[in-house]
Amino acid sequence: MYYIDGKTARWEVVIGLEVHAQILSKNKLFSDAPCDSTKGPNTAVTLFDAAMPGVLPVLNFNCVEKAIRAGLGLGGKINLYSVFERKHYFYPDLPHGYQITQNSYPIITGGCVRIRNPDKVIRINRIHIEQDAGKSIHNLAPGKTYIDLNRAGIPLMEIVSEPDISSPAEAVAYVDKLKLILQYVCASNANMEKGELRCDANVSVRRGGESGLGTRCEIKNLNSTKSLAQAIEHEAKRQVEVLESGGTIVVETKLFDVDTLSTIATRSKESATEYRYFADPDLLPLVLEEKYVEDIKASMPELPDERENRYVRELNLSPYDANVLVSNVNASRYFDALLELGHQPKLAARWITVELFGLLNKRGIKIVESPVTPALMDELLRLVHSAEISERTAKEVLRKSFEGMGSPKEIVERESLRQVTDDKVILGYVKEVLDENPTKLGEYFMGKEKMLAFLVGQVIKKSNGNASPHLVNKVLLEELERRRAQNG
């Protein structure tokens, strides 16, 4: 249990998260503008996004499907009736003066996320669909603010947890698992580095053992799990200091400064009344058919926990290897691609998690960007399986292929790396090594068995690493016994 030790008591932290995940869609929620905030300023904007008079919203049903997939993946209830409402507030990058969202009737209610360490279930209150705002840019010119509406109207789903989270570590575990599920069900790429997932943390504290909830403050727009953990920890400690000094916590909205590691109040938190919610008159209620939801359910993929259990139970992977693979959706897909090509699960897992991951980490890139595709890894592993190259050589071939020096087959052919499997050729290497090392040979005959490993190494070295270790061992032992018998 996570506590903050104050001067007068031990304090518990109570956390609820609102996660804003960008829905995986080519187009915006209510217009056909592309979802691309990397384009030049205000170039991915339609008349509706810019709030020109008389232009009406048209719902992108692909976004509805993705939200349903998220809801199913999280075990929520899909509501066949939901309503889009206008949430009114003023901000320069919100051209309509309101955000189209869902409040009273969200598309998903309920659900949960199971985390580990500790093993715990975090309940989800609701998931609703809404549009993103634009972007205010303050650092282009002194005293001026510029508005880029490329992001305005990008589809989001807001996933609201219950206040079941009790520590910064649990908050990070929840977000990581939530991201993974969204990626598996193809509802969102959920890449925090690209701004595709942001968190608002509602934080309060209470004395250990109490059951009521304290006054909460909301920390907005946390764009990494590191800043999420730091912001929660700082805000919780701040609240403890205020309460222990006799003060009271004011309900307010805050931002987290990553440079000073402190939270900064921006405004008192608005109530639902101040937002003046009402049903958007330009959008009909969203009414879904049961068959539509059932068809989506039938197309749902295997979820992370199910896949991890299958890897352990059916493929006999270690729990560690299964977890490493499943914790990265693209690594899991890479692994499954190798299985479909006929490779043994444990071998495929080792080459991905040890050899390929080592190269990826060294270069600082993700597996989806790997120069060595599953097809190239298949080519490499077939060379190993057929004993055309040794595992030792294969590791070097993998490195060279990763660096763009060709396919595994091309590298093996170009550099004459095929393993020597001819007994007569290996016997020639063995005789040369034994003739060059009479002292070591004598020590072996006198009972020093460890000399065998030395002699095997010398034979492989003489073959430039191309001799099969298994055959070297076999031929060497036969020649040693022949010489022992010859010497009487």
UniProtKB/Swiss-Prot annotation:
Q: Span of the secretion signal?
A: none
Q: Can you tell me where the transmembrane regions are?
A: none
Under the heading SUPFAM superfamilies, the entry gives: GatB/YqeY motif, Glutamine synthetase/guanido kinase
Please name the GO terms that the record assigns under molecular function: asparaginyl-tRNA synthase (glutamine-hydrolyzing) activity; ATP binding; glutaminyl-tRNA synthase (glutamine-hydrolyzing) activity
Q: Which reaction does it catalyse?
A: L-glutamyl-tRNA(Gln) + L-glutamine + ATP + H2O = L-glutaminyl-tRNA(Gln) + L-glutamate + ADP + phosphate + H(+); L-aspartyl-tRNA(Asn) + L-glutamine + ATP + H2O = L-asparaginyl-tRNA(Asn) + L-glutamate + ADP + phosphate + 2 H(+)
Pfam families, sorted? GatB_N, GatB_Yqey
Alphabetically sorted, this entry's keywords are:
ATP-binding, Ligase, Nucleotide-binding, Protein biosynthesis
The record's listing under SMART domains reads: GatB_Yqey (SM00845)
Q: Which InterPro entries match?
A: Asn/Gln-tRNA_amidoTrfase_suB/E (IPR017959), Asn/Gln-tRNA_Trfase_suB/E_cat (IPR006075), Asn/Gln_amidotransferase (IPR018027), Asn/Gln_tRNA_amidoTrase-B-like (IPR003789), GatB (IPR004413), GatB_C_1 (IPR042114), GatB_Yqey_C_2 (IPR023168), Gln-tRNA_amidoTrfase_suB_CS (IPR017958)
This protein's GO cellular component annotations are:
glutamyl-tRNA(Gln) amidotransferase complex
Q: Which family does it belong to?
A: Belongs to the GatB/GatE family. GatB subfamily.
**How would you summarize the oligomeric state and partners of this protein?**
Heterotrimer of A, B and C subunits.
Which function does this protein serve?
A: Allows the formation of correctly charged Asn-tRNA(Asn) or Gln-tRNA(Gln) through the transamidation of misacylated Asp-tRNA(Asn) or Glu-tRNA(Gln) in organisms which lack either or both of asparaginyl-tRNA or glutaminyl-tRNA synthetases. The reaction takes place in the presence of glutamine and ATP through an activated phospho-Asp-tRNA(Asn) or phospho-Glu-tRNA(Gln).
> In its UniProt entry, what is this protein called?
Aspartyl/glutamyl-tRNA(Asn/Gln) amidotransferase subunit B
Taxonomic lineage from the root: Bacteria, Pseudomonadati, Pseudomonadota, Alphaproteobacteria, Rickettsiales
